[in-house]
Amino acid sequence: MGLFGGRADIQLAKSYLPPFACPVMQANMEYGLNGTYDGMSVVIIPALCDTLRCMTQNWRFGVKKIPMAPIVYPQNRKSPAALEYLISEYEQVLVILATVTGEMMKERCLQETIQVYNAHNAAMREFADLAADHLDIITPKVRHAVMKSAWFYEKGEHTQIIKEINEELKKLPVHEFTGISCEPDEILDILEKNNIAIVADDLVQESQQYRTDTPSNGGGGLKRLAKQWMGRYGCSLIHEEGKPRGQMLIDMCREKKADGVISCMMKFCDPEEYDQPYFERDLRKAGYPCLAIEIDPLNTNYEQLLTRVQAFAELF
């Protein structure tokens, strides 16, 4: 299960997070404090940005009903020591999970889980490709719903559902986003009303999750999981020399024949804000117009966004 907040009425979280914190984390903290997340066994929090680092401690002291397992991912991924370090981080997480569940992860189970997740990645990548060929059916809201649903299903069950959707799409005649997420649905409705279709995305909440498989060999389960992190690319939360994300987006635009790029800038998201000038510069040099929109799941007024999207759509 993935925690991406929601339209929470921020009250209790104000005691733990400042108003300029990421709205997703504000909502997650509020839901943890007000009991919405009660029933969860444990929460794993990766310390990938300043707000997430604060969340590890805020959750530990504020949400006592739900244990928290922190994990710090290495950013100097070229160093051999980074692999060993990440394995040790995973081992600590497993100890916390064993304390909560009463069972230690078995190597055989971990290997099988990796296979299940890799199969799910492949199904989701195929869906993203097929969706671009059926934009009359897979509207922005439908596409988002399919992608987001993966966070709330057992992966094996969700894989089967996606495979069935893919098979149905294949029977039909064939007639890009970047950022963290593109919610709530009002934003997707605005895009659809302005005849903007999504042919690809680079959202953390969506396709970025399925871009990199865990290696099928190369050691035990934990080592292979660590190698998967080392193999990730094109994400603002991962350090990469030379800022290659722009060229990656250009290649995506060319492959999917995109007309432009909408940058979904999560409010108060420092890692995304650091990346934005670089990839927008590269995209504009390549001839792709860019529109940067602020994503705030707590917002309820979208008139200004509607005007900006209308103006952007008139470019094409």
Listing of model-derived features with the role each one plays in the protein:
Residues 1-109, 204-205, 209-316:
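Trp/Phe/Arg-rich N-terminal binding region typifying the photolyase-homology
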Residues 91, 95-213, 238:
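A charged, amphipathic alpha-helical module
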